[in-house]
From Swiss-Prot:
The keyword Cell inner membrane does not apply. Gene3D superfamilies: Photosystem II CP47 reaction center protein (3.10.680.10). It holds the Pfam family PSII. The chain crosses the membrane at residues 21-36, 101-115, 140-156, 203-218, 237-252, 457-472. This is Photosystem II CP47 reaction center protein. Binds multiple chlorophylls. PSII binds additional chlorophylls, carotenoids and specific lipids. Belongs to the PsbB/PsbC family. PsbB subfamily. It is a multi-pass membrane protein. The gene is psbB. Keywords: Chlorophyll, Chloroplast, Chromophore, Membrane, Photosynthesis, Photosystem II, Plastid, Thylakoid, Transmembrane, Transmembrane helix. GO terms for cellular component: chloroplast thylakoid membrane; photosystem II.
Length: 508
């Protein structure tokens, strides 16, 4: 029977051995991709400047995930935090990649073995001798094992009892490191930014999974439920599995885009909402204000601001600024950040301090407008000089830098002031190297943006897959004319296929 390309998976419908084979091969491909991608990223990753050229600026995708689980060292002698390493041990970045590739090879061989030896006694009913799968029991086994893994991760790996812990940082992404995390069992455990919730939720969900698995192993489903939900049909398994996957994809798309303890900004870059809400700008102002109240000068106060914090307060690190179809890392857009020029402070000829209105996330161009402390427009860069009232020249705006490379330097010529006013629209002002990577000056998104876009799209796709396969299994009698009570497990690749005249259609 010839099959069109979109129906080829039906060849494993009544063949448990080869169903296992294709799933093992799929896992081999996933594991092989992960290991290979890690090696590729390690080959192109430059660990020399974790502050101004972190992994997320370089477009690393799998390295952040390896890092958040506790791996920080490389066999190349470097650490993600900038220190030199002499003995990285097995669980280095390269070690993790190698283990995935070795696992992929073993799974590849296992898949071939199961494809060749598909007709095992294990898959035959002891009473009838016919091929059959006890799907509710298999569900119980999977639930029990995944619960065990979930519990083990939360109770041992995350807590540091037997493992490194996970990446934990402060709210501003400045002091991150791998450390053990104690479970948070109170209401604080439900705070998405509290790492303690990761430990407690894995422990709780793991215990629930273990108990649910044991329940499904020891209790048989009622006959009416078994028939009503088509528990004897493997397409029911496909449908419910797709549901689990699309739900997980929606959840992680949300936690990645909006931010959480599981997606630290040091590894994945800031979120767009931190730019929209002036999150870093407010913290910087607060720190400067504290320093001034301690008697420091403006220059000294701004010099105390960590370059890392200032760099977060720059629109080019906002994942919403990169178009979805602009390929490449952030460094390929605005360039490799070299240094912070300092905080630009603007004043008019009357001595009022002026603030440049910052560009919102969804604008490519935005008028350059300078406001005073009360929000009144005092200066701008006009579109048409003939009608201008607030031009830099007319208002006599000057700019002075505090902190950074231009600390103490001031400019009064209008052309230079306009240049820095335009750049101040984008947050703190940095110097970029655009020559090394031939960067084109067009913003790119961070791995946070790619991950969200990919998972939201696949979640939607898989949602329709769940509806499709759920509908097929629940209404098999309507769509294919096959009695839903027909439980014959028959020869590989021959029966229960659409358009196959030899399929039995009714239960005896």
């Amino acid at each position: 029977m010839g099959l069109p390309w979109y129906r080829v998976h039906t060849v494993v419908l009544n063949d448990p051995g080869r169903l296992i084979a294709v799933h093992i091969m799929h896992t081999a491909l996933v594991s092989g991709w992960a290991g290979s991608m890690a090696l590729y990223e390690l080959a192109v990753f430059d660990p020399s400047d974790p502050v101004l050229d972190p992994m997320w600026r370089q477009g690393m995708f799998v390295i952040p995930f390896i890092t958040r689980l506790g791996v920080t060292k490389s066999w190349g002698g470097w650490s993600i935090t900038g220190e030199t390493v002499t003995n990285a041990g097995l669980w280095s970045y390269e070690g993790v990649a190698a283990v995935h590739i070795i696992l992929s090879g073993l799974l590849f061989l296992a898949a071939i073995w199961h494809w060749v030896f598909w007709d095992l006694e294990l898959f035959r009913d002891e009473r009838t001798g016919k091929p059959s799968l006890d799907l509710p029991k298999i569900f119980g086994i999977h639930l029990f094992l995944s619960g065990l893994l979930c519990f083990g991760f939360g109770a041992f790996h995350v807590t540091g009892l037997f493992g490194p812990g996970i990446w934990v940082s402060d709210p501003y992404g400045l002091t991150g490191s791998v450390q053990p995390v104690s479970p948070a069992w109170g209401a604080e455990g439900f705070d998405p930014f509290n790492a303690g919730g990761i430990a407690s939720h894995h422990i709780a969900a793991g215990i629930l999974g273990i108990l649910a698995g044991l329940f499904h192993l020891s209790v048989r489903p009622p006959q009416r439920l078994y028939k009503g939900l088509r528990m004897g049909n493997v397409e029911t398994v496909l449908s419910s599995s797709i549901a689990a996957v699309f739900w997980a994809a929606f959840v992680v798309a949300g936690t990645m885009w909006y931010g959480s303890a599981a997606t630290p900004i040091e590894l994945f870059g800031p979120t767009r909402y931190q730019w929209d809400q002036g999150y870093f700008e407010q913290e910087i102002d607060k720190r400067v204000g504290t320093s001034l109240s301690e008697g420091l000068t403006l220059s000294e106060a701004w010099s105390k601001i960590p370059e890392k914090l200032a760099f977060y307060d720059y629109i080019g690190n906002n994942p919403a600024k990169g178009g979805l179809f602009r390929a490449g890392a952030m460094d390929n857009g605005d360039g490799i950040a070299v240094g912070w020029l300092g905080h630009a402070s603007f004043k008019d000829k009357e001595g009022r301090e002026l603030f440049v209105r910052r560009m919102p996330s969804f604008f490519e161009t935005f008028p350059v407008v300078l406001l005073d402390s009360e929000g009144i427009v005092r200066a701008d860069v006009p579109f048409r000089r003939a009608e201008s009232k607030y031009s830099i020249e007319q208002v006599g705006v000057t700019v002075q830098f505090y902190g950074g490379e231009l600390d103490g330097v001031s400019f009064s010529d209008p052309a230079t002031v306009k240049k820095y006013a335009r750049r101040a629209q984008l947050g703190e002002i940095f110097e970029f190297d655009r020559a090394t990577l031939k960067s084109d000056g067009v913003f790119r998104s961070s791995p946070r943006g790619w991950f969200t876009f990919g998972h939201a799209n696949f979640a939607l796709l898989f949602f329709f897959g769940h509806i499709w396969h759920g509908g097929r299994t629940l209404f098999r009698d309507v769509f294919a004319g096959i009695d839903p009570d027909l439980d014959a497990q028959v020869e590989f690749g021959l029966f229960q296929k659409l358009g196959d005249p030899s399929t039995r259609r009714e239960a005896v």
